[in-house]
Every structure is written in structure tokens, then in C-alpha cells.
Amino acid sequence: MGIEEKAPSGFMLAKVSDLVGLIRKSSLWPVTMGLACCAIEMMATGTPRFDISRFGMEVFRASPRQADLMIVSGRVSQKMAPVVRQVYDQMSEPKWVLSMGVCASSGGMFNNYAVVQGVDHILPVDIYLPGCPPRPEMLLNAILELHEQIRSEPLGANRAEAARAVEAAALRATPTHEMTGLLA
């Protein structure tokens, strides 16, 4: 005998945060940040065979001001790192980052001075997608995982402050190339 039985038909009971999360996850606009081979697989995700538009991501944005998801696909060189950070800073809040491929996540086979050993050195990363290169199906799965993160994100007056704290903590964290015992 709860309120659900007493509500007239046509009414839905939900929290505002649940509705906002549902709307946000269904309207991600990714910015193009294809830097190497993984970009080919990212482009393939937009083709009719994989159809990323069924998740509300019809068009990859060329302007960071119109995007809220950055998919970093491929290695990031030291010269490109400030540009990647500038594009991230120009994106509107709330914003998310997906690191696509082993090169973006940890530098991959390019273990030298010219390549950033993981994009997490310059950006807070929400989802790491392994593979060289990862298949479009894996990218779609990572996007679905990100959807779940977005849907369950809290709302409130201090949301921007909390986001800055999370970003600062992510940038202070131990980089993946310095971690030991991950495979043991």
C-alpha cells in the first residue's frame, strides 16, 4: 500500500537526479581526438554497421565547446599534450574522458621521451579501454560503462567543486607506468 498504487495512471515516480542522469547519458557529444591508429576504429564505430547514433552520439564534434566527451585514441606526443589539455579545458562541464587503446592509456610500445606514457598524466580519465587497437564493439561497451557512471553521478550545489577535487586527485595519483604488481 505505497504511493505507487495511489498515483493515477500516466504518472511516474522518480528522483530528479535519476531523470537528469538518464537524460545526460543519452546525449553525449564526443569531440574528435584521433591521434593514431585507434582513430580508424573510432571512425568505424560511427558507420552503419556499429551505429553509435543509437546511443545519442550521432555527430563527432569538431569544436570542444560543443562536446562533453573526449575520446583520446592513440599515442599522445609531448608536443601534442598541451593541445590535448587545451581542448579538454575548452569543453563544457560536465565532461568525461575515455582513453582508447594501450598507447593512450600507458604509452604502449612507444616507451621513449617523445610520447606521454599515458594520457592520465595530463587529463583525468574516466574509462580506460585496452587493446591495440580496440575493436568498435569494445568502444561501444566502454561507452555503455560510461553511461552507467554518468547515470549514477550525484547532483548538488557542490558538484563543480567535487569534480575539481576528483580531477586533482586523479592527476596526483600514481601513473600507471609506475605501478607494480598489476598482473601478479
Curated annotation (Swiss-Prot):
Q: What is its EC number?
A: 7.1.1.-
Q: Which organism encodes this protein?
A: Beutenbergia cavernae (strain ATCC BAA-8 / DSM 12333 / CCUG 43141 / JCM 11478 / NBRC 16432 / NCIMB 13614 / HKI 0122)
Q: What gene, per UniProt, encodes this protein? A: nuoB
Instruction: Tell me the cofactors it needs.
Output: [4Fe-4S] cluster
Where does it localize?
Cell membrane
The protein's name is NADH-quinone oxidoreductase subunit B
Kindly state the subunit structure of this protein: NDH-1 is composed of 14 different subunits. Subunits NuoB, C, D, E, F, and G constitute the peripheral sector of the complex.
Q: Where does [4Fe-4S] cluster bind?
A: 37-38, 103, 132
Tell me its family.
Belongs to the complex I 20 kDa subunit family.
**Signal peptide location:** none
InterPro entries, per this entry? NADH_UbQ_OxRdtase-like_20kDa, NADH_UQ_OxRdtase_20Kd_su
Cofactor binding, per record? Binds 1 [4Fe-4S] cluster.
Q: Looking at its record, which EC class is this enzyme? A: translocase
Supply one GO BP term. aerobic respiration
Task: List the GO cellular component terms.
Answer: plasma membrane; respiratory chain complex I
Q: Does the keyword 4Fe-4S apply?
A: yes
Q: Tell me which domain of life the UniProt entry assigns to the organism this sequence originates from.
A: Bacteria
Keyword Iron tagged = yes
Primary location: membrane
Instruction: Give the protein's biological function.
Output: NDH-1 shuttles electrons from NADH, via FMN and iron-sulfur (Fe-S) centers, to quinones in the respiratory chain. The immediate electron acceptor for the enzyme in this species is believed to be a menaquinone. Couples the redox reaction to proton translocation (for every two electrons transferred, four hydrogen ions are translocated across the cytoplasmic membrane), and thus conserves the redox energy in a proton gradient.
